[in-house]
Amino acid sequence: MSTESKCPFAGGAYANTEAGAKGNRDWWPKQLNLDILHQHSSLSNPLEENFDYASEFQSLDLDAVVKDLHALMTTSQDWWPADFGHYGGLFIRMAWHSAGTYRIYDGRGGASRGAQRFAPLNSWPDNVNLDKARRLLWPIKQKYGRKISWADLMILAGNVALESMGFKTFGFGGGREDIWEPEKDINWGPETTWLGDERYSGNRELANPLGAVQMGLIYVNPEGPNGNPDPLASARDIRETFARMAMNDEETVALIAGGHTFGKTHGAAPASHVGLEPEGASIEEQGLGWKNSFGTGVGKDAITSGLEVIWTPTPTQWDMSYLETLYGYEWELTKSPAGAHQWKPKGDAGAGTVPDAFDAKKRHQPSMLTSDIALRTDPAYDKICRDFMAHPDKYADAFARAWYKLTHRDMGPITRYLGPLVPKEELIWQDPVPAVDHELVNDADVEALKAEVLASGLTIPQLVSTAWAAASSFRGSDRRGGANGARIRLEPQKNWEANQPAELAKVLAKLEGIQQKFNGAQQGGKKISLADLIVLAGNAGVEAAAKKAGHDVKVPFAPGRTDATQEQTDAPTFAPLEPKADGFRNYAKKGLEDAAAYLLIDKAQLLTLTAPEMTVLVGGLRALGANYGQSKHGVFTSRPETLTNDFFVNLLDMNTAWAKSEKAAGEFEGRDRKTGQIKWTASIVDLVFGSNSQLRALAEVYATSDSTEAFVKDFVAAWTKVMNLDRFDLKK
């Protein structure tokens, strides 16, 4: 018998642990990805289940952390020396790139989960050497432990970097909780190579929901589109990508000009000297990547972007020098030592005006990126730059506010912000709602109001659909939307196709009448908001439908929502929240019918639902008749508006044979196998609960004869969860 040792991987003994092993989605690429509904569970979180980060952060000596960060900025380490003796530029870039992945179309990305620590972000080409920034922060993270998350620390480090170089920031709010595994729900693009750009169609139209121009970039290619040094074309890319972060032209100029006031870029030699990124590097590198074989590999020999740019004469000081330099010279193309396109003053003007990052005896001329020259070339950006030069205080305020917005955009309302550095001013992009300034309804009021709603002539489908439309606008990604604020009665939500505007207006008018009658009859200032009444009315509909099925249930209700005004609502940035499809309502815009099942999973993930919660909600909402346009698709019951498990029972009935309908795309007909008569009609979303093996397993749970009570209980729990998704006041 051979005693020769062999690698166990070669024989496939541990193939299930190899990244290259084929998984189910390799065999069946079109399979639904339900994994995104179960990420970030307690099973991957090393902290105890009752860990309360908000309480830990509130007990933190934030002044001490800030003091330590200030000291870090100028304590250069030999293993990664500080440019100009100050790490400020590096930490600004780290914070910017942590926050800058946010995109408005689905609210994903951003700084609020500390995702830069994990793949793919930790290994993106645009994040080269930010692994070093996080390692520099590690002693501070180690010192304060669980009292400050990586997510908060990275943004705070960016703020302190700015402050330490003389800039006054707008404020800082803590409260970002770390995740412990990569985010599986984010579509970063279709490309399979770094810096690929298969995300365009037509005249360079960037696909939704993507926010960057190429795979692995935060925003734009600093050399210009695909490395083409065309400033006007670069300006177009800049405007598009920053708009996808909800930044206007003024905010865009302020961020670029303000950020490039500090530090430098690194391109000492060609990229051939740079090793693999952290996720691909050897084990002895211990999570670091991009090992550089040129010279010392660090300091003056560092290679990051391949560009070798120092923008200003004062790269560790806040001043007007970036704009003064940009407009102080005429610029011409040149190349960095790494061969990347960048710009220098014509005629070698400005020689000796810019310091060397490591040798006090050396001086250089300033240089710029194509994306910098774009600010001067584009007429709108140019006008803003000149205005900022004439009004330095306006410029500083614009940068402070834009930086605050950039780094806090995905945190939700200001009520979630923690710590003594939170500014008092509430801004429109934080989706403000009025504070409760009245006595709330009590249990007796709630019962009386539900009775009034049920006697109003409004149907169960109307009540349920309206509450669902309001609450399900919530996105767990950036904590926007939801029932609080009653924005369903405002632009743009009141006119969204999925909300059936004409029908919605009738329901809201009835509910407003009930609200006014109740509030007018109260003594002492007790009131119910329309936002509360919309949810309460939906609850009343669910309870009435459950009662028809023989179940006496009470749906939990917590008053305390208030009604926002149109002036408190940033209509343009709410527009991307409009659902393209909502499988819970059996709704899909024309042309998206075939993708409806995938979009259901995406919607469920944004609603923070698990697969069982999604399943029970779909089945229950079909029974309640909550379909868009009163469609009968998926209403597999002879007793509509009754909270039964009939959807699951009849979906799994083998006496029904399904076939595609010839009437419309994405529609199906269920016929009696014996008679051939049509029994039911369905959408792809309906049938996927019988087709997909995981969803069928869940459907079977709710189709059994002993599941009726569990079905109602689980539906009420999942319904209540959705109604309260934006009630951050209840979760403190």
UniProtKB/Swiss-Prot annotation:
Record bears the keyword Nucleus: no
Coiled coil location: none
The protein's enzyme class: oxidoreductase
Transition state stabilizer (site feature) positions: R93
Post-translational modification note: Formation of the three residue Trp-Tyr-Met cross-link is important for the catalase, but not the peroxidase activity of the enzyme.
Residues that, per the record, bind heme b: H260
Catalytic activity: H2O2 + AH2 = A + 2 H2O; 2 H2O2 = O2 + 2 H2O
EC code(s) of this entry: 1.11.1.21
Leader sequence segment: 1-15
One Pfam family here: peroxidase
GO MF annotations in UniProt: catalase activity; heme binding; metal ion binding
GO biological process: cellular response to hydrogen peroxide; hydrogen peroxide catabolic process
Cellular component GO terms held in the UniProt record: cytosol
Placement of covalent cross-link Tryptophyl-tyrosyl-methioninium (Trp-Tyr) (with M-245): W96-Y219
InterPro entries: Catalase_peroxidase (IPR000763), Haem_peroxidase (IPR002016), Haem_peroxidase_sf (IPR010255), Peroxidases_AS (IPR019794), Peroxidases_heam-ligand_BS (IPR019793)
Entries under PROSITE patterns matching the protein: PEROXIDASE_1, PEROXIDASE_2, PEROXIDASE_4
CDD domains recorded: catalase_peroxidase_1, catalase_peroxidase_2
Active site: H97
Record text on cofactor binding: Binds 1 heme b (iron(II)-protoporphyrin IX) group per dimer.
Keyword annotations of the record: Heme, Hydrogen peroxide, Iron, Metal-binding, Oxidoreductase, Peroxidase, Signal
Cross-link (Tryptophyl-tyrosyl-methioninium (Tyr-Met) (with W-96)): Y219-M245
Cofactor: heme b
Function: Bifunctional enzyme with both catalase and broad-spectrum peroxidase activity.
Quaternary context: Homodimer or homotetramer.
Family, as annotated: Belongs to the peroxidase family. Peroxidase/catalase subfamily.
Protein name: Catalase-peroxidase
